[in-house]
Amino acid sequence: MSSSESSSASGGGRPDAGQPPSEEQAMPRLDTLISHLVAAKRSLSSINHVWRANEIVTAARAALEECVVVSARTGFLRRGLNNQLRLLYSVRTEVEEISLRGRSEFAAVLKDLDDADTRLRRTLELLRETIVHPAFRPEGEDPKSLHDFVDERGVEELHAALKSSIDRTTAAQAQLDSSNHAFDDELLSIKEALGTYRTAAKLASSRSSSSASSSSASNSSLPSMSTMPSMLHSLEMHAQEMANLLESLVRHFDLCVTAVKHTEGGGAAAKSITGDMPVGVPVSGRMGSNIEDINDNLNAPLDPLSNSEYQEMVNVLFKDAAEAEDVVMEIQDRISEMESVLENVLAQRDALRSIYNATTDIYQHLSSLGSTRLPGYIAQAHNFTQVWHEENDRISGGLADLSDLNSLYDGFLDAYDGLIVEVARRKHVRQRVEKVLRDARHKLDQLYEEDVTARETFRVEKGDYLPSDIWPEIGREPMRIEFRRISGANVQAVNLQRPHEQEAITGEQEAANRLAPVESSDGDEIIPDLPRDLVEQAFARLKARVKGAT
């Protein structure tokens, strides 16, 4: 709009009557000027937009300052949180490794225990299934198995001790699992909080990206504030331009007031129209800020105008009136743009607030976790490790005891088979002895008969010629040989020692250790008569054990 203004006339009313008719006819009608004055007054309501523009600039500046502070705080907290989260997940990984390692070792030990117990039970079952041959036991006794000669109280006590160790380890493992599950719940809640944080960061970044020419801001964890200074500068430029546009509207209004007042009958109309001016609208260039200033401007005396000056003022007024509506629309467009920019600024501020709140929530959660519950999770892992080390030693000892018992009972089975083979061997030796005795008896009897016959022949042929006292034994019969069975002494160290060990024993020790043979009442050693197949089976089992051992 034009900024030219006409000087005021000293007197009101229409121009002089002596003017030429053509100029008088060119003068505008008062109602036309009044309509322009009313429109100009209406356009001054745009001052509300200017005030709003100032508020927007102030709010945007405050939001930018807050964003700088909040972003700095968030960045500081986030760097600390990253370190704490890495440490927290390292602790969780270590605790989980302790649990998995202990579980694996415990499972391996349990498998070894199961295998050893299975072997022991299988051996005990073989003892139950192996019936002692009746030939070994007194006549009339109920059948017995090898298991009847075993005291299982040691096995039961060992099982009870192992069960106690297993139960204690299982309880410690269950407590560790419960602790780890609670730890996982803590991590899950932290993940949820991190999800809230990421959502807020993504939203803020998307808004920042939409207002920027590049999308680099959307790739960062915190929204970029690089666009906010430019937006604030844009708001300031809009506000300044709106103030300039409002100033042009005020000048146009002043021009309308002056034109109406210089028109005959327009003074009262101008005063009536300008009686309720918006507060703060400057009139007649005096920048009045209240109604009293406006009234003073309206009551001020007018400077006289010539017809040409008046006509020039009216021409400027008409020209500006045609542009006033566009100026008002431009102010409205600018305030709409400023509102949109402010909304974007406040949205980024709110997003940063959300990120900061989410960050502080995570920080408080981590602080609470680190000061109260995390030491308990770590202590539970140490407790499990201590319990497992203690019980692992006990279980390893019990495993060795199970193996020893199994070896003992397996040796019992092997010894019983060896006993059967030994009985068969002794039976065979007895048979050989009997054969030797039979052969010897036959030869002795034969010699005896021959000797008796020879003595009788000698007595018949020579006896009558020899005096009886020449040899008293001449008429005696041959001696007779009798075999007597004597029970053997117990096989003691003397009989079992090696030759060089026997030589080291003194005569007294040898006399003490060697038990004298005891004559049995029945004169014979009882050797059980075992079936051939029983002996063969025992011998086959012994061979299988020897082969399996090699």
UniProtKB/Swiss-Prot annotation:
<comment type="function">
    <text>Autophagy-specific protein that functions in response to autophagy-inducing signals as a scaffold to recruit other ATG proteins to organize pre-autophagosomal structure (PAS) formation. Modulates the timing and magnitude of the autophagy response, such as the size of the sequestering vesicles. Plays particularly a role in pexophagy and nucleophagy.</text>
</comment>
<feature type="coiled-coil region">
    <location>
        <begin position="427"/>
        <end position="451"/>
    </location>
</feature>
<keyword id="KW-0072">Autophagy</keyword>
<feature type="region of interest" description="Disordered">
    <location>
        <begin position="1"/>
        <end position="24"/>
    </location>
</feature>
<protein>
    <recommendedName>
        <fullName>Autophagy-related protein 17</fullName>
    </recommendedName>
</protein>
<comment type="similarity">
    <text>Belongs to the ATG17 family.</text>
</comment>
<keyword id="KW-0472">Membrane</keyword>
<keyword id="KW-0963">Cytoplasm</keyword>
<dbReference type="GO" id="GO:0034727">
    <property type="term" value="P:piecemeal microautophagy of the nucleus"/>
</dbReference>
<dbReference type="GO" id="GO:0000422">
    <property type="term" value="P:autophagy of mitochondrion"/>
</dbReference>
<feature type="region of interest" description="Disordered">
    <location>
        <begin position="204"/>
        <end position="226"/>
    </location>
</feature>
<dbReference type="InterPro" id="IPR007240">
    <property type="entry name" value="Atg17"/>
</dbReference>
<dbReference type="GO" id="GO:1990316">
    <property type="term" value="C:Atg1/ULK1 kinase complex"/>
</dbReference>
<dbReference type="GO" id="GO:0034045">
    <property type="term" value="C:phagophore assembly site membrane"/>
</dbReference>
<dbReference type="GO" id="GO:0060090">
    <property type="term" value="F:molecular adaptor activity"/>
</dbReference>
<dbReference type="GO" id="GO:0000045">
    <property type="term" value="P:autophagosome assembly"/>
</dbReference>
<dbReference type="Pfam" id="PF04108">
    <property type="entry name" value="ATG17_like"/>
</dbReference>
<dbReference type="InterPro" id="IPR045326">
    <property type="entry name" value="ATG17-like_dom"/>
</dbReference>
<dbReference type="GO" id="GO:0030295">
    <property type="term" value="F:protein kinase activator activity"/>
</dbReference>
<feature type="coiled-coil region">
    <location>
        <begin position="317"/>
        <end position="354"/>
    </location>
</feature>
<keyword id="KW-0175">Coiled coil</keyword>
